[in-house]
């Protein structure tokens, strides 16, 4: 469970090595300096530097979550817009019912269902891993798609195709719930904008439905969705940690689960810090982007504070 000194001399050496003889403030300052220097300690199980292990595992999770987020935006926003434009119709009722049902499906159950159906029953898609073991792809960046492009003496087209096949089931498992949530959020935003006075004024001027939607409705409806996308990022990463274990995906989630099983507390601590830092950075980036495209929001917040 930790480093246990065998004698007094080893005890003193460990105290000096980790600056435990200093005050709490000095220890915390030393901790921050080592943290920003990339010295995150070593794994208690493998003995490898944690910075190297995290930098290999984290890009795999980012790649998986980014592909899932692409599916969420590609499917969720158009379906939400379509449902909102036909609010309270039979089509809207069908899409809304499917999205509510999909939102209630547990991600682990869905992932197991995909494995049983598309991998074991039909054999259409790979069961686990990021790529077939026959492809020797050196992990230069940690992002498999980029590493394939940088690799030498490899059939890049075949490797890229195989990597995409390995992505399908994990990505769909992660994106399923978030897509359902995005449909409902977009639908509600479209309905709210359609009831605004400036939309009624645009209709009275004789603008067509297509002109009203693309010039006035879409942009104003997407503005409230951007801050909520930060919440979807958290959901995607949380679901990715579960899905990675089921699909043996070598990401940070699977790595953290293994650290829990092996009681590798130093790896668990630094892994959670890396994930939380990533989520905070993405949230801040989305908020800054939202302020950039919607300056009125900053004025509104300055008035309400």
Predicted regions mapped to residue ranges:
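Hydrophobic alpha-helical transmembrane segments of membrane transport/permease proteins
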Residues: 1-29, 118-157
């Amino acid at each position: 469970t930790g480093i246990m000194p065998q004698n007094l001399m080893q005890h003193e050496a460990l105290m000096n090595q980790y600056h435990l003889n200093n005050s709490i403030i000095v220890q915390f300052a030393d901790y921050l300096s080592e943290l920003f220097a990339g010295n995150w300690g070593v794994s208690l199980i493998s003995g490898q530097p944690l910075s190297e292990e995290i930098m290999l595992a984290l890009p795999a999770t980012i790649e998986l979550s980014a592909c899932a987020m692409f599916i969420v935006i590609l499917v969720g926003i158009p379906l939400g817009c379509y449902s909102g434009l036909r609010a309270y119709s039979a089509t809207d009722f069908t899409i809304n019912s499917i999205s509510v049902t999909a939102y209630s499906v547990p991600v682990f159950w869905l992932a197991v269902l995909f494995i049983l159906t598309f991998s074991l029953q039909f054999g259409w898609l790979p069961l686990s891993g990021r790529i077939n073991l026959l492809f020797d792809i050196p992990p230069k960046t940690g992002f498999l798609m980029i590493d394939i492009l940088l690799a030498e003496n490899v059939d890049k087209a075949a490797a890229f195709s195989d990597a995409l096949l390995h992505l399908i089931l994990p990505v769909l498992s992660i994106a399923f719930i978030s897509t359902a949530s995005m449909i409902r959020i977009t639908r509600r935003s479209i309905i709210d904008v359609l009831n605004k006075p400036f939309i009624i004024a645009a209709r009275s001027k004789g603008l067509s439905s297509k002109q009203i939607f693309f010039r006035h409705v879409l942009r104003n409806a997407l503005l409230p969705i951007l801050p909520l996308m930060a919440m979807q990022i958290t959901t995607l990463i949380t679901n990715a940690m579960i899905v990675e274990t089921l699909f043996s995906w070598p990401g940070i989630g699977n790595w953290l689960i293994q650290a829990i099983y092996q009681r590798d507390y130093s790896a668990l601590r630094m892994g959670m810090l890396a994930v939380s830092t990533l989520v905070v950075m993405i949230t801040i980036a989305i908020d800054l982007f939202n302020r950039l495209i919607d300056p009125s929001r900053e004025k509104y917040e300055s008035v309400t504070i």
